Swiss-Prot record:
Keyword Transmembrane: no
Name of the protein in its database record: Phenylalanine--tRNA ligase alpha subunit
Catalysed reaction, written as an equation: tRNA(Phe) + L-phenylalanine + ATP = L-phenylalanyl-tRNA(Phe) + AMP + diphosphate + H(+)
Family as reported in the entry's similarity comment: Belongs to the class-II aminoacyl-tRNA synthetase family. Phe-tRNA synthetase alpha subunit type 1 subfamily.
Entry's localization field: Cytoplasm
UniProt keyword annotation of tRNA-binding present: no
Organism in which the protein naturally occurs: Pseudomonas aeruginosa (strain ATCC 15692 / DSM 22644 / CIP 104116 / JCM 14847 / LMG 12228 / 1C / PRS 101 / PAO1)
Entry keyword set: Aminoacyl-tRNA synthetase, ATP-binding, Cytoplasm, Ligase, Magnesium, Metal-binding, Nucleotide-binding, Protein biosynthesis
EC number: 6.1.1.20
Main localisation: cytoplasm
Length: 338
């Protein structure tokens, strides 16, 4: 028993002088492990008389528990001290200004496209899409555009070969829709289009939204009402809207749509060239030949179509004076639209 008391005293002394958790684990193994000092004492019980074994075994267990309790307490103490030291070294000065997180935002053209789609979705139009690489038939022939039309010239259209090209408008989507389903049809067709043009107000690639409605009894009055309500909803103003006679091969009659200048409210400024009006889109009643090419009876069904440039509307809505700013990827510019 004297040997047992001495082992316990040694173990407790070693624990008290230990300043490291790893060293503490080594002490535990040395005294309480499978081959530890106190474990070896327990194995000597077999050498004692049977009547002494329970008493001595109980004493050994008490000694082991005492050492284990001191080990646990010291481990908790050392871990707490280590945590406190780490927290002191890594503490955060909450009085420092925050760094903040930069948040992204939708591109102004994307915002404009979504706004246009929402305006028409609310009145029953569906969004239709089609390929950007088109064939000559869907881009020109099916839209009543003859071979001598200026739009077919090489300097206006990007051709891959004699039959394939980058679409110059989203009207081919309207043709494909009319070919695949019978009226009533109510669609808007947003997408990228391509033309050989580049200056302050034109880009070789830009976004266009065209609309088509085909049904029985459709009139130009329906077209005017639709366009007027859309423009007032888009700009959130009671704008004056006017329709000027024009010509498009795929509509008859055709019109250009002007709105009261959103910059000067019609008083005349540099943007509207002192006229008080801004051209925003083209429209008209679908030409009977276009309906026939898509196997729709023009005697039974009528339709109207319209088309607008998304960048043009974005420039007017946000007061941007150079179309190319939309494609420069300048974060100083784009950050204004978050």
């Amino acid at each position: 028993m004297e040997n047992l008391d001495a082992l316990v005293s040694q173990a407790l002394e070693a624990v008290r002088h230990t300043e490291d958790v790893n060293a503490l684990e080594q002490i535990r193994v040395h005294y309480l492990g499978k081959k530890g000092e106190l474990t070896q004492v327990m194995k000597t019980l077999g050498d004692l008389p049977a009547e002494e074994r329970p008493k001595v075994g109980a004493l050994i267990n008490v000694a082991k528990e005492k050492v284990q309790d001191v080990l646990n307490a010291r481990k908790t103490e050392l871990e707490g001290a280590a945590l406190a030291a780490r927290l002191a070294a890594e503490r955060i000065d909450v009085t420092l200004p925050g760094r903040g997180q930069l948040s992204g935002g939708l591109h102004p053209v994307t915002r404009t496209l979504e706004r246009i789609e929402q305006c028409f979705s609310r009145i029953g139009y569906e969004v239709a899409e089609g390929p950007e690489v088109e064939d000559d038939y869907h881009n020109f022939e099916a839209l009543n555009i003859p071979g001598h039309h200026p739009a077919r010239a090489m300097h206006d259209t990007f051709y891959f070969n004699a039959n394939m090209l980058l679409r110059t408008h989203t009207s081919p989507v309207q043709v494909r829709t009319m070919e695949s389903q019978q009226p009533p049809i109510r669609i808007v067709c947003p997408g990228r289009v391509y033309r050989c043009d580049s200056d302050l107000t034109h880009s070789p690639m830009f976004h266009q939204v065209e609309g088509l409605l085909v049904d029985e009894g459709v009139s130009f009055a329906d077209l005017k009402g639709t366009i007027e309500e859309f423009l007032r909803a888009f700009f959130e103003k009671q704008l004056e809207v006017r329709f000027r006679p024009s010509f498009f091969p795929f509509t008859e009659p055709s019109a250009e749509v002007d709105i009261q200048c959103v910059i000067c409210s019609g008083n005349g400024c540099r943007v509207c060239k002192q006229t008080g009006w801004l051209e925003v889109m083209g429209c008209g009643m679908v030409h009977p030949n276009v309906l026939r090419m898509s196997n729709i009876d023009p005697e039974k069904f009528q339709g109207f179509a319209f088309g607008m440039g998304a960048e043009r509307l974005a420039m007017l809505r946000y007061g941007v004076n150079d179309l190319r700013l939309f494609f420069d990827n300048d974060l100083r510019f784009l950050g204004q639209f978050r």
